[in-house]
Amino acid sequence: FITLYAENDEEQQEELIVREIKDGANAIILAPVREDLAVMKLDEISPGCPVIFLGPTAINSSVACSISVDRYEMGRTLGEKIAESEDPAVPVCLFSEGMAYTGNLDAYDGIRSVLDPAGFTVRLIEKKSEDTYRKAIEETVYPESGDFMAVGMDVGALSELADILEGSSVYREHVTALYGIGSTTALLNQLDRGIVKGLMAWNRFDEGYLSVEKAVQAAGGEWKEKRITLTPEYIDGEILRSGIFEKMLYPME
């Protein structure tokens, strides 16, 4: 079996799937760039071997098992944490690598389900070029623009926002708080340093381990679970330093 993932390039991902099927893969672990397109393409391709799908999807003849985190719930929980801690008078900018990418729209709907009724003004900024996020933040230094809170709706957006803010104390004066979805070692360090105020994380080690386990079972014709849902957790600096989720956040250490 083989794990396939091409970041933000669904065409390349489809080519890889077809290539590996032709080469006789016994199972495929697929982390889709775009869930909707991936499901349609799998139906067209009819891979002939079981697919372990990292994301929520309907189980069919191709998809043996789906492993996912509830993105809507993740967005809703993040929205609750923001509403508990922040002033609704400060606008919220939601930054996204693209709403078409897997899970982003669900997370967006989840966070807005809380922030809108709580009286927050919410603006969506989708990445259109390499400097989309930086330009949006640069605008805050002009008096007529005003301050805002930033939320990275995916790990790519959150990582870039954190790096931009860490590199400029001026920007940090105008972006009142940074929240987001996703965790990397770099992001956890930035959370510890206070660049990121809070983020949603889930057990990536379990996700990877389970996907391989289910692929082996499916290749051998034996598996039971059709859908596995991972539980997201909210992490802030205090929770991080408490060590409660140390095994989840740093599984290899």
Predicted regions and their residues:
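Periplasmic-binding protein-like
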Residues: 24-32, 50-54, 92-96, 122-123, ...
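Flexible loop/hinge segments that line or gate small-molecule binding clefts
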Residues: 34-73, 184-192
